[in-house]
Amino acid sequence: MMKQKANVKSMSKEGESLDTSKKTNHLINRRNFIGKTIAGTGALWLLGTNAKKTEGKESKMPIWSGDLKTTAKLPAQIPQTSKPNKLNMIIIIADTWRADHLGCYGSTRVKTPYLDKFAKESVLFTNANAEGLPTIPCRRVYHTGRSVLPESRWEPLDKSDVTFAEVLQKHGITTGFIADTYHHFAPNMNFHRGFDSWQWIRGQEFDRYKSGPKEKYDPKKHMPEHLWNENYDRNMRQYLMNTQDREKDEDYFCTRSCRAAMDWLEQNINNKPFMLWLDMFDPHEPWDAPARFQKMYRDKYPYERYLFGYGVRVKDIRSDDLPVIRDLYAAEVTFSDYCIGRLLKKIEEMGLMDNTIIVFSTDHGTHLGEEGCVQKTPGLLNACVTHIPLIIRHPDERFAGKRIDGLVSAVDFMPTFLPLLGIEDYKNMDGENMWKLATGDVSSIHDDVYTVFDVFGSIHNLDWHYFQNIKGDDPGKGPCLYDLKNDRGQTRNVVREFPEAAKDLRNKLQNHLKIEIPPLRL
C-alpha cells in the first residue's frame, strides 16, 4: 500500500475548516474562476506572439508564448547526482477522456484507430485512477508527484512545490509546455513553472479571449429551447466569440495544439534530451467536433452546430437529449484521436520513436447520463470519472503490447517518469514507480487507490469500488459500493448487500485521508 506523506498544508496552514460551507477568500474554485477576467494576470504571459501557418495561410488566432528561463528560479532542494539517460519524453494529456471510449480499452462503438495502434506498441495500464479532481487539482498531482488529498482544491502550485519540469531543467533537459487548457494560465495559476518555453493557445471554453461582437451571436440557435438559461447563454456566447475566426479543421483547438507541438519538436529536435508536455483541453466540453466527425455517429443533428457545454442544468436534460449528447462526445473523442494521430505520425517521421518515451493520459472522465448525471459529477464518483486511460510507449520493443492490470494512481506519474529518464536522485514524492509493474520487478504497488472530488471520496481496489460524501450530509448517489468481480462496469450499487465490506472500505478511506468522515449510513 502506498505510504501517504503529509501534504495537507493547505488545510492546516491557517487553521482552515474542512467544512465546505466555510469559504476562505484566497481559494479559487472553478466556478469562481469562470466569472473572472484574465486581464489581471499581468504582462508576464504576453511576452510575444508566434504566428502559426496552416496550409500556407497565416492563422488569425495567436498563440501567446514566453521564455521563462531568465525568470524561473529553481528550488535549491533539487539534487543533481543522477545523470539523465538521453531519452526524450513527450507527454500528451487530453482532458475529460473516458477510458471506456477507447477501442484499446474495450469500446466497440467509439472510433479511436490512432491511439489503438499506439497502444499495440506500448504498455497499457488497465487500472489507472485519478487522485484529486477536477482539472487543476489533477495537474497539481501530475506536476509534483504529491498527493493533494484529503482536499481537492482549485489552487496554484505552492511556492514549496517542486515540479517535474523543474527537476528536469536542473538536470539539463530542455522543457517545453504547450496548452490550450486555459486554467493553467488563469489568474493566480502558475503551471508553466520550470519550462524553458511555453505556449498558451487562447480561446478554449470560457477563456475571456474575445469580448465581441456579442450581438452577432445567439446561443439559442445552437441548443434546444428547454436547455437554455442565462448562465448557459453567457458561456456559449463567449465560446462563439472565441471561435468566430474558425473556418476549417485546422482552426480547431485540438488541431492547433498538436500543430504547435509539431512545430516545437522541429525547433527543438537538436536540444537533446528534451521533454515536451502537451496539455489539450479536448475532448472537454463544448463538444463541437468538425461535421465530418460528428457524421460518423449520426447523419443529422438537431442543429447545424449543436453546442453542449457547461451551464446546462441537469434537471433540464430530457431522455431524448442523451443520445445526441453521447454522439457529440464520441465525435469529439474521435476528432481528438485523429489530431493525436497526426502528431504521432510526425514524431515517427522525425525519427524520434527510437529515443523518445511517449505518454498518453487524461485527468478524468465524464458522465453521459449514468444515474441521471451528465458531465463530471462529484456525487457519482464512479469509474466514469475516476478510471483514466494511461498508455506509455517505450523505445525498447520488449514492452510493446503489454497490459498491466495492477492498480496505479495519478500520483504515480512523476515517480515513474523521472526514473524512466534516468533521474533517481529526487525522492520528495508520494507515489510509486509503476514501471516496475511493466518490468516485472513487482506484481503490485498499491492495495487500494483513492480519489477525492469536491466533498466526495472513493476507494478502489481490484475487488470493490466504494464512494461516499466525506464532509457533509448530502449523499449524492452514495454511499455506493460496486462489486467489481461481477460488475466491472459499475452499474449496480450493492452497499446494502455487503454492509461489512462497505464499512471496512469506509474505514480505510478515513484512515488514508486522515480526517474524520461521516459514518456509513444505509
List PLM regions with ranges.
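Catalytic domains that recognize anionic headgroups
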Residues: F33-G48, T54-L522
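N-terminal secretory signal peptides and thylakoid transit peptides that target proteins
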Residues: E16-T41
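Serine/proline-rich low-complexity intrinsically disordered segments, especially terminal tails, linkers
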Residues: S12-E14, D19, K23, M61, ...
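Intrinsically disordered, low-complexity regions enriched in serine, threonine, proline
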Residues: A6, L27-I28, N50, G66
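N-terminal acidic, proline/glycine-rich, low-complexity intrinsically disordered segments
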Residues: M1-M11
